[in-house]
UniProtKB/Swiss-Prot annotation:
One of its GO terms (biological process) is positive regulation of translation. Its EC number is 3.6.5.n1. The lineage of its organism: Bacteria, Bacillati, Mycoplasmatota, Mycoplasmoidales, Mycoplasmoidaceae. This is Elongation factor 4. NCBIfam families: lepA, small_GTP. GO terms for cellular component: plasma membrane. It holds the Pfam family GTP_EFTU_D2. Residues 4-185 form the tr-type G domain. GTP binds at residues 16-21, 132-135. HAMAP family: LepA. CDD domains: EF4_II, EF4_III, LepA, lepA_C. InterPro entries: EF-4, EFG_III/V, EFG_V-like, EFTu-like_2, G_TR_CS, LepA_C_sf, LepA_CTD, LepA_IV. It comes from the Bacteria.
Length: 598
């Protein structure tokens, strides 16, 4: 199809504002799509996405649309809405000319909506504001229109109003997309230049790559070269998604599609790479693709050490479709061989762990997450550590700096006081208060990332009944009074349970930690002391009592000395067992430790 009839666009929005449902309605309106094949969340292909009702992976689909007697080609990229997956949004925007900025009329513009707007503006994309859920009783359409007017300066009367659930206003939206999203500008006659914006591993085809052709064209059997790895492959299969995989012989400038080339070396494929023809050595790579840096770090260890090689293989495959994931191999004294991973947030961590367990049949234990600290030693040397157990002795440390993030919290007026108290309790530094509209405010705080990753978000949702939304961005490192708290079980240090806490909150955190461990670790045949220490000083302690076996049950009548003898023998046995016995940790221990009870 000629380029003037192609429209490449993404749908971006806050979580739960209806992106996937709107995608379903657009797919439903496309030419040639059979309605019997439609299912809810059509573009959410992972089981975990359907169960949680959220989008995790971006997904691109080609749709043929009719407008009057003209046919158009839409390339729609559905994107996640959660703050942890912002990098997926930035990847999809690199392949588009326009975006639909979708807002739920019952909730208004949220913190993540504004963050996504800035992403679109940075990429110089045409932004089409769209108001969804206008048919609901609680919808405040006029207020949302005014909020869009303040944010983007658009005429409130030109904003499309839709209900993705019922299909209201979808036809008008299609017309708006055709009129406002500019067609791609690529030249088919120029040498091939394509952006690799996503990939995944197929056990039969090898690596399957999703690309946007910016210049030239790509044909079946063409030889291609990856600009970064310099690897050369021959195209085996080529095609589009509509939303099912469909093979084609050629992809032209402006189009979005996929290819497989029998790629088995996973390291050859890097999302964000530029693809050119094999003989082309002069075409420069496409600019502007940013590498995303992890925010939190966590160790993953297989319960069965024999699964370690399977875990290594699984990590190589999963990183193909998740460029934000970083990992390196490590060994824990308590948990054995594993990988230390860098994630963008707690949801990202949960999703990766769940995918590893489901897709690769692994049983994993995850250590408590931490952030990356900068440590200045007394000899002037600087270290960067993301594993608390590697922190040097206190006598060698001059200062420890921790990452601070700028937090944006959008909330209704009447929760303002309680949220300010919450931020102060999490060592927040107040910056400013902004007015969004008559009854909504935006709080801006500087906060330590190490505090946010524990229970801040859950507590925020709890005290605001779910009405607050949160977004954050890295600001800077600040020197803080921090200490390493080590946990000892049965007088043995468990390195995977170490954590770093602020001096003012170390005792409180350590006490809670010990109490939780007491609840979560099952009773053994011997008594287990749980101790939290800073250096050589014990700051908190709990004890798990031994399981009592009634050794006198088989006695009847007779001499009391026989009973005493059996009890003494049991006592000696427990002492011996305590000296050599190891404490078994349940698999779900670490995830439960993260959930703050109060």
């Amino acid at each position: 199809m000629e380029q003037q009839k192609i429209r490449n666009f993404s749908i971006i929005a806050h979580i739960d504002h209806g992106k996937s449902t709107l995608s379903d309605r657009l797919i439903e309106r496309s030419i040639g799509f059979e309605k019997r094949l439609l299912q809810a969340q059509m573009l959410d292909t992972m089981a975990i996405e359907r169960e949680r009702g959220i989008t995790i992976k971006l997904n691109a689909v080609q749709l043929k649309m009719a407008q009057g007697n003209q046919q158009y080609l839409f390339h729609l990229v559905d994107t996640p809405g959660h703050v942890d997956f912002t990098y997926e949004v930035s990847r999809s925007l690199a392949a588009c000319e326009g975006v639909l900025l979708l807002v739920d009329a019952t909730q208004g513009i949220q913190a993540q909506t504004i963050s996504n707007t800035y992403l679109a503006l940075e990429n110089n994309l045409e932004i089409i504001p769209v108001i969804n859920k206008v048919d609901m009783e609680s919808a405040d359409v006029e207020k949302t229109k005014q909020a869009f007017h303040q944010l983007l300066g658009v005429d409130p009367n030109t904003i499309p109003l839709v209900s993705a659930k019922t299909g209201l206003g979808i036809d008008q939206l299609i017309t708006t997309i055709i009129e406002k999203v500019p067609p791609p500008k690529g030249d088919e006659s120029k040498p091939l230049k394509a952006l690799l914006f996503d990939s995944y591993y197929d056990p039969y085809k090898g690596v399957v790559c999703f690309i946007r052709i910016f210049e030239g064209s790509l044909k079946l059997n063409d030889k291609i070269r990856f600009a970064r790895s310099n690897s050369v492959y021959q195209i085996v299969e080529l095609g589009i998604k509509n939303p099912f995989f469909e093979k084609q012989d050629v992809l032209k400038a402006g189009e979005i599609g996929w290819f497989s080339a029998g790629i088995k070396k996973l390291r050859d494929v890097t999302v964000g790479d530029t693809i050119v023809h094999a003989e082309d050595t002069t075409t420069p790579p496409l600019p502007g693709y940013k590498k995303v840096l992890p925010m939190i770090y966590c160790g993953l260890y297989p319960i069965d050490n024999n699964d370690y090689q399977n875990l290594k293989m699984a990590m190589e495959k999963i990183i193909l479709s998740d460029v934000a994931l970083e990992y390196e191999y490590e060994t824990s004294q308590a948990l054995g061989f594993g990988v230390r991973c860098g994630f963008l947030g707690l949801l990202h961590m949960d999703v990766i762990k769940e995918r590893l367990e489901r897709e690769y049949n692994l049983k994993l234990i995850s250590a408590p997450p931490s952030v990356r600290y900068k440590v200045l030693l007394t000899n002037g040397e600087e270290l960067e550590l993301d594993n608390p157990s590697l922190l040097p002795e206190r006598s060698r440390i001059k200062s420890i700096s921790e990452p601070f993030v700028r937090v944006y919290i959008d909330l209704p007026d009447h929760y303002l006081g309680t949220v300010i108290d919450l931020c102060q309790n999490f060592r927040g530094q107040y910056e400013k208060l902004e007015e969004i509209d008559i009854d909504r405010k935006r709080l801006v705080y500087l906060m330590p990332l190490g505090e946010i990753i524990y229970s801040f978000f859950d507590k925020l949702k709890s005290i605001t009944k779910g009405y607050a939304s949160l977004n954050y961005e890295f600001d800077q490192y600040q020197v803080s009074q921090l200490a390493k708290v080590e946990i000892m079980l049965n007088k043995q240090k468990v390195d995977a349970l170490s954590f770093i806490a602020h001096h003012d909150f170390a005792f409180q955190r350590a006490k809670k930690f010990c109490v939780k461990l007491k609840e979560l670790i099952p009773k053994h045949l011997f008594e287990i002391p749980i101790q939290a220490t800073i250096g050589s000083k014990v700051i908190a302690r709990e004890t798990i009592k031994a399981v009592r076996k009634d050794v006198t049950a088989k006695l009847y009548g007779g001499d009391v000395t026989r009973k005493k003898k059996l009890l003494e023998k049991q006592k000696e046995g427990k002492k011996r067992l305590k000296a050599i016995g190891s404490v078994e940790l349940p698999q779900e221990l670490f995830s439960h430790l993260l959930k703050d009870e109060d």
